[in-house]
Amino acid sequence: MSRLHKWLDRYLSSLERDNASPYTVKNYGTDISQFLDYCGEQGIHTLEQLDRDVVRAYMAELNEDGYVRASIARRVFELRAFGDYLVQHDIWDENLFRRIYAPRVPRKLPRYLTIEEVKRLLAAPDTSTPKGMRDRAILEVLYGSGVRVSELVGLDLRDVDLAAGELHVIGKG
């Protein structure tokens, strides 16, 4: 395992300690490790050997491999966060990833359901069964509140206040 990969392991451990989503930790680990593997293939094994040209060449390779702009931009943001960690812990003098520009990703308006689609969706569960009632309640909460599926799955009975008509949700941000 290279020294760079050891820094990555420490960074991922710090994300876990900071209660980052397991998906975030996994995705950051996979993506940053892929970059570090690329560095190793280029003969780069220390932070001192890293420069903007290496990072740009890596981003160009991702582009050539068919990665979409949003995926490349995500990699830049992940590398910036990793670099920030290294600087904050006095491992690296300057986060050169901050000087790499992420590709602009056009923002699309979300596709929304029509009233008819919502009615059909909510009518789909068979509410004559306990499972169907549960599924209908799940759909109602998702549609009516806008919570993420991961937030809904994390709810417990103590998070539901029927008297006040409230759900207590701890979200991402």
Language model features: what each stretch is:
Residues 1-173:
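Conserved catalytic core of the tyrosine transesterase superfamily
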